[in-house]
Regions:
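A short acidic, Gly/Pro-enriched loop at the edge of an enzyme's catalytic core
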Residues: 207-217
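Conserved beta-strand signature within the Rossmann-like core of class I S-adenosyl-L-methionine
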Residues: 243-251
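A short glycine-rich, Lys/Arg-flanked "PGG" loop and its adjoining helix->strand segment in the class I
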Residues: 230-242
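A short SAM/SAH-binding and catalytic strip from SAM-dependent methyltransferases
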Residues: 215-229
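Class I SAM-dependent methyltransferase SAM/SAH-binding core
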Residues: 153-155, 160-206
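Helix-start (N-cap) detector for alpha-helical repeat units in TPR-like alpha-solenoids
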Residues: 15-16, 49-50, 83-84, 183
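Short coil turns that delineate tetratricopeptide repeat
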Residues: 12, 46, 80-81
Length: 311
């Protein structure tokens, strides 16, 4: 079940109060009370998208799939940009194709809300180490290619608060970061490690850059919010000079293709990644199983790859 919106405003004070009580009940796993209170809020404010989303999620938890889908669909119709991640819930219950589940608006809202506590929760709570793993992999990949590990210009896709730039300090002459979340970018700006920061979707950002402009593109736990990585790979190859690296981590699953996990992230199969790398003009320099973070104390399986633009 995707995260609930942190707040909701319907324009009706009493409806907002009922919604707050409903969200509190949901957070306490009292789904029957949450559904009842959400219905009360919607009686007062029928066009309250967050109220429909909360009702749908409570009904899903109660096993009332048909009613839940109707409520979730109503929420999506009222707010098609979907910052609440309703599409994810619809995909999980089979009412929407998983490839269409995650929107830019959802990712932006999620990380705007997450930004103030992002590093503390991710690093201390989840033992996150994606940037360090990528930095180490780049050193090993450079050694395999008998080349210097230093890079003249790097693009950090989904840069977040700047953890990747810290891990690459002293390795890149210039680094630019891109992220959907302005609040994450505000945190990254405080590091003073970036030569430029851009608020944009990553494929659109790459498409606006010159061919051969960079010699490193990094994406630490960012592709988990994209189902189809084809455009990201193709645009990364285009902006890379010959011999440049694309290094990234993703979540893994044992099968083929791409699946949407219960954690509202995509997991990519090894064969999918290898086939796509070859199809988009990359040579796989390094590919290995890793875990970049934990979930409830257990390692989350993933892949780490360093690919080279060889032609």
């Amino acid at each position: 079940m995707s995260p609930l919106p942190s707040s909701g405003a319907s324009g009706d004070l009493l409806a907002d109060r009922r919604y707050a009580y409903a969200k509190g009940a949901f957070d306490e796993a009292d789904f029957a009370a949450a559904a009842d209170l959400a219905r009360q809020a919607l009686e007062l404010a029928p066009h309250f998208a967050a109220g429909h989303a909360l009702l749908g999620r409570a009904l899903l938890a109660l096993g009332a799939r048909e009613e839940a889908v109707a409520s979730l669909a109503a929420a999506l119709a009222l707010d098609p940009a979907d910052p609440m991640g309703v599409r994810i819930d619809l995909a999980h219950c089979g009412a929407l194709e998983p490839q269409a589940a995650i929107t830019d608006s959802y990712v932006r809202a999620l990380f705007d809300d997450y930004a103030p506590r992002f590093e503390r929760h991710l690093v201390e709570g989840l033992n996150y180490r994606g940037p360090e793993l990528i930095a180490d992999a780049l050193r090993r990949a450079a050694s395999r290619r008998v080349r210097d590990v230093r890079f003249r210009r790097a693009f950090d896709l989904g840069c977040g608060t700047g953890l990747m730039a810290r891990a690459l300090a002293g390795t890149v002459a210039a680094i630019e970061g891109v992220d959907l979340s302005p609040r994450m970018l505000a945190q990254a700006r405080k590091t003073r490690l970036y030569d430029a920061l851009h608020e944009a979707e990553l494929v659109a950002f790459l498409a606006g850059r010159a061919a051969g402009e960079a010699d490193l593109v990094v994406a630490a736990d960012v592709f988990v919010y994209l189902a189809d990585l084809g455009d990201a790979f193709r645009e990364s190859r285009r902006v890379l000079a010959r011999g440049g690296f694309l290094a990234f981590t993703v979540q893994a699953h044992p099968g083929d293709g791409v699946v949407l996990g219960e954690d509202a992230r995509y997991a990519h199969g090894e064969a999918y990644l290898r086939d796509l790398a070859a199809a988009t003009g990359f040579t796989m320099v390094l590919f290995e199983p890793v875990s970049t973070r934990e979930d409830r104390g257990a390692p989350v399986p993933g892949h780490l790859a360093v690919m080279e633009r060889s032609v």
